């Protein structure tokens, strides 16, 4: 059975204000498909549906009513969508509250402004081969872009040694793509503080414990958090023709 996916979709989208004008939440920015506009989130959900994912928890806050109004409970799309509105708290605090809504032992966490069409079966298989890890981060192997920079130091076997380092020494620098899978054991590392962040608090703590692995992919990914990357994703959709989430229909977008 496929795990629940927690999507972090509550950010203010400050870098994308020239597109949203603070009138729409970042996951709902319009993307054209066959002459009609669909929200970015519908393309992400379509990919997840095509990979067998059926249960989604959307962590919302900023202009949340627009997301809830559009997707509802997910029934008409063949999915089960629930919502968690923790208010203006940081990402680890959001994840902790959302994980309390599911009994799944493994949970996928996905940034709500990222489209990375991974093969979820392979992603899970790799995680299951490393039961010692509490977290596995999807990383890009060879990305070289003016808009993104490598931020994880990993060893030969994919174990994460450091975060936000510019020099890897004997190791390699790769880019965290905003998709990860975790075991419930991470909950013991997240305090009840609303100021708990995934990257600033949880990542360093788990890296020190040597329980963070990676899944490497060469599949192109898109972060619509900036106008340049948003435009790049729109061009990708136009060129490749990937489908948004449509009522009772699925889309198996390109996978790694």
Question: Which positions does each model-derived feature cover?
Answer:
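Short beta->alpha linker loops
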Residues: 62-63, 87-90, 118, 219, ...
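Conserved beta-loop-beta/alpha segment of the NTase-like Rossmann-fold superfamily
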Residues: 68-69, 74-156
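Well-ordered alpha-helical segments embedded in enzymatic catalytic cores
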Residues: 40-43, 94-97, 202
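Residues at the starts of beta-strands that form the adenosine-phosphate
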Residues: 4, 54-56, 80, 134-135, ...
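Hydrophobic packing residues within well-ordered alpha-helices of enzyme cores
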Residues: 16, 67-71, 190, 233
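N-terminal glycine-rich phosphate-binding loop and ensuing alpha1 helix
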Residues: 1-65
């Amino acid at each position: 059975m496929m795990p629940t996916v927690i999507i972090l979709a509550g950010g203010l989208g400050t870098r994308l204000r020239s597109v949203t004008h603070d009138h729409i939440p970042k996951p709902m920015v319009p993307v054209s498909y066959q002459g009609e506009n669909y929200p970015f989130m519908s393309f992400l959900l379509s990919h997840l549906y095509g990979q067998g994912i059926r249960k989604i928890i959307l962590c919302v806050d900023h202009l949340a009513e627009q997301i809830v109004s559009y997707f509802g409970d997910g029934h008409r799309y063949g999915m089960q969508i629930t919502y968690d509105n923790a208010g203006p708290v940081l990402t680890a605090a959001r994840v902790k509250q959302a994980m309390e809504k599911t009994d799944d032992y493994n949970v996928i966490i996905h940034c709500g402004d990222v489209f990375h069409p991974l093969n979820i079966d392979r992603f899970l298989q790799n995680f299951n081969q490393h039961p010692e890890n509490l977290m596995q981060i999807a990383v890009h192997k060879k990305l070289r872009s003016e808009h993104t920079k490598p931020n994880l130091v990993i060893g030969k076997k994919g174990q994460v040694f450091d975060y936000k380092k510019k020099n890897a020494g004997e190791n390699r620098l790769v880019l965290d793509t905003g998709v990860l899978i975790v075991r419930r054991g991470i909950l013991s590392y997240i305090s009840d503080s609303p100021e708990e962040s995934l990257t600033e608090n949880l990542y360093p703590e788990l890296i020190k414990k040597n329980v963070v692995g990676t899944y490497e992919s060469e599949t192109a990914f898109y972060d619509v958090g900036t106008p340049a990357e948003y435009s790049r994703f729109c061009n990708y959709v136009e060129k490749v023709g990937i489908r948004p989430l449509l009522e009772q229909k699925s889309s198996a977008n390109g996978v790694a």
